[in-house]
């Protein structure tokens, strides 16, 4: 008798436990279906589609997954979608009932059968559309960027300019003095000497890399369903010079931008200490602050990138990081008369970043030239600080550097992809 009575709560608890466990298992599967549905609406491919297409994808995914759950009644999901700028957020909510295997168990307590167990849940997923971006490329074409690009090239140039003390720089002078080109066959400048020797210079590789980058940008914008516009400038001692900026602004004609970039060349000077025949500038051929001030005036306030009319803005700088300007009042290094040779003054970088414009920096290492007396006197004392200084100019995560024998094309493309990824994550 006692044993028989004890079976009643045991049967009750066992039946309830089995029904609860069954419902919990089904709810786990429905939660997974909701997760899959929410994610289906924000895949990279679906982010390129309309809201209605994304809603349909989420609905179909949930229905297909939930259809495999037996002994349950699943109501159509409630799917909400919001788009705020580049951000899409999708929430999939569901209600369902699990059919109980022991509906009479509850009648011992409530006096009525309970044929189902209620279930509900939701899942949320968020993703980002690729932003539309205007890129402003500011490329250093001062004489120091015309150094031989490889270790072998540097050795070749030094060995063939021994009468000058060994010079790895292929300076481009239209009217060189005898001292400038001492020992060169025919009296040609070092630029022509490098060409005759088959020495590839860093600026040549930069031009090729910039041109190749336009092809990468075109392929990437097509894949992302975004618009990337380009403006290309060089800078030296006189500020910035336009290489490509139709109508004074970035252009979406990336093919034309690539063609223009392939023509980038080193600053041509008259002779040592002379920019032109009548402009004795003491070789002050790199003024970063003036260049930054100039490009800053060209860049409008950035948008959020959600439309081509409201693009984000990215300033892309390639340089070896050495200023060479007339500056007798605020030079951080010893002066040569009024000539200031120092690491870039990055105060304008702070100004630009403060406007919400991202800065990507490729530092092409200013290579030690121990056989060159000018380098040893004026550049060597601060050469080791250049990389840190250039990194301080860049936005977080948008700094890259290469040295001798480095692949400038790969470096620029890596930095470009980092800039795109960072632009998306900031929204």
List each model region and its residues.
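Short amphipathic secondary-structure patches
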Residues: 38-98, 212-240, 294, 397, ...
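Von Willebrand factor A/integrin I-like adhesion domains
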Residues: 58, 62-72, 362-427
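VWA/integrin I-like adhesion module and closely mimicked acidic/polar interface patches used
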Residues: 149-153, 158-171, 321-389
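Alpha-helical assembly-interface signal, strongest on the long, hydrophobic N-terminal helix that forms
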Residues: 1-55, 153, 360, 394
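Short beta-strand-loop
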Residues: 226-275, 329, 370-390
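Von Willebrand factor
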Residues: 38-42, 132-316, 323, 363-365, 403-411
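DG-centered beta-turn motif at the end of beta-strands
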Residues: 137-142, 206, 232-235, 295, ...
């Amino acid at each position: 008798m006692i044993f028989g009575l004890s079976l009643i709560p045991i049967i009750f608890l066992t039946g309830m436990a089995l029904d609860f466990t069954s419902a919990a298992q089904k709810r786990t599967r429905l939660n997974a279906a909701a997760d899959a549905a929410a994610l289906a609406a924000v895949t990279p491919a679906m982010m390129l589609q309309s809201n209605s297409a994304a809603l349909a994808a989420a609905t179909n995914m949930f229905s297909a997954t939930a259809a495999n759950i037996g002994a349950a009644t699943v109501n159509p999901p409630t799917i909400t979608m919001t788009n705020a700028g580049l951000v899409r957020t999708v929430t999939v909510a569901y209600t369902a009932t699990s059919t109980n295997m022991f509906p009479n168990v509850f009648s011992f307590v409530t006096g009525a059968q309970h044929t189902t167990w209620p279930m509900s849940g939701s899942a949320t997923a968020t993703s980002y559309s690729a932003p539309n971006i205007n890129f402003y490329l500011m490329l250093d074409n001062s004489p120091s960027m015309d150094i031989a690009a490889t270790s072998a090239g540097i050795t070749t140039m030094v060995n063939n300019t021994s009468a000058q003390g060994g010079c790895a720089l292929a300076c481009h002078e239209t009217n060189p003095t005898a001292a400038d080109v001492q020992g060169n066959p025919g009296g040609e400048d070092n630029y022509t000497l490098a060409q005759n020797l088959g020495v590839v210079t860093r600026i040549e590789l930069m031009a090729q890399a910039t041109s190749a980058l336009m092809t990468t940008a075109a392929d990437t914008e097509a894949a992302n369903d975004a618009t990337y516009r380009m403006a290309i400038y060089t800078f030296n001692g006189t500020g910035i010079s336009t290489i490509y900026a139709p109508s004074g602004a970035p252009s979406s004609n990336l093919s034309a931008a690539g063609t223009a970039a392939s023509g980038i060349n080193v600053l041509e000077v008259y002779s040592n200490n002379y920019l032109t025949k009548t402009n004795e500038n003491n070789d002050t051929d790199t003024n970063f602050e003036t260049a930054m001030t100039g490009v800053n005036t060209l860049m409008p306030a950035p948008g959020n990138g959600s439309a081509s009319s409201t693009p984000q803005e990215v300033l892309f700088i390639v340089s070896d990081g050495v200023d060479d300007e007339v500056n007798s009042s605020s030079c951080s290094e010893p002066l040569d008369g009024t000539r200031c040779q120092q690491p870039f003054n990055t105060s304008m970088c702070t100004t630009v970043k403060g406007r919400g414009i991202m800065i990507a920096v490729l530092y092409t290492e200013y290579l030690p030239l121990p056989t060159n007396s000018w380098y040893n006197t004026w550049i060597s004392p601060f050469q080791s600080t250049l990389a840190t200084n250039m990194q301080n100019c860049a936005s977080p995560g948008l700094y890259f550097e290469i040295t001798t024998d480095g692949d400038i094309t790969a470096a620029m493309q890596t930095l470009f992809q980092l800039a795109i990824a960072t632009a998306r994550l900031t929204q």
